[in-house]
Amino acid sequence: MSDEQQQPVFSIEKVYVKDLSVEIPNAPRIYLERETPEVNIQLHSKSERIDETLYEVVLTTTVTAKIKDKTMFLVEIQQGGVFQIRHVPEAEMELVLGIACPNILFPYLREAVSDTVTRAGFHPVILNPVNFEALYYQRKQQTENSAAPQTPETQQITH
């Protein structure tokens, strides 16, 4: 085989919103509230091989805003991407799927969250940048130290 055929290949085949849900259980009265809500953000990443060279990576976020014990809104979005990955050493594949792909998907997820919350009638929620590399190594360290680790494809962030 020539050197060209063995060069690593990485391309974005598709970026899409896989799932989106919005709940505003206390509407319309919740719109009368003037207090600043407490916002909780959870972020998960998982990957799946869908054929010989294609992988799906999905970032899922759940954003919950509450005032005292009342939920203002709950938004859950799954931002998916299909990536073609070839000739990448197996040892590096976990890094590509756990760091590079989520870094590509995150701006799309951030935009979807902001747009969805705004369309629901609230001030936008802008997700802060995420260091997926630090999260990857933190999760890896937790997995090595834990008797019941999270699956390697999942990571969680709570703000």
From Swiss-Prot:
Output the SUPFAM superfamilies linked to this UniProt entry.
SecB-like
List membrane-spanning regions.
Answer: none
Instruction: Output the Gene Ontology terms for molecular function.
Output: unfolded protein binding
Q: Which Pfam families match?
A: SecB
Instruction: Give compartment(s).
Output: Cytoplasm
Task: Determine if Transport is one of this entry's keywords.
Answer: yes
Instruction: Give start-end of the signal peptide.
Output: none
* Annotated keywords: Chaperone, Cytoplasm, Protein transport, Translocation, Transport
- Indicate yes or no for the key word Transport: yes
Q: Which InterPro entries match?
A: SecB, SecB-like_sf
Which GO BP terms apply?
protein folding; protein tetramerization; protein transport
Q: Which domain of life is it from?
A: Bacteria
Subunit info here reads:
Homotetramer, a dimer of dimers. One homotetramer interacts with 1 SecA dimer.
What NCBIfam families is this protein classified in? Answer: PRK05751.1-3, PRK05751.1-4, PRK05751.1-5, secB
Q: What family does the database annotate?
A: Belongs to the SecB family.
Q: Which HAMAP family match?
A: SecB
Purpose: One of the proteins required for the normal export of preproteins out of the cell cytoplasm. It is a molecular chaperone that binds to a subset of precursor proteins, maintaining them in a translocation-competent state. It also specifically binds to its receptor SecA.
Q: What is this protein called?
A: Protein-export protein SecB
Q: Which gene encodes it?
A: secB
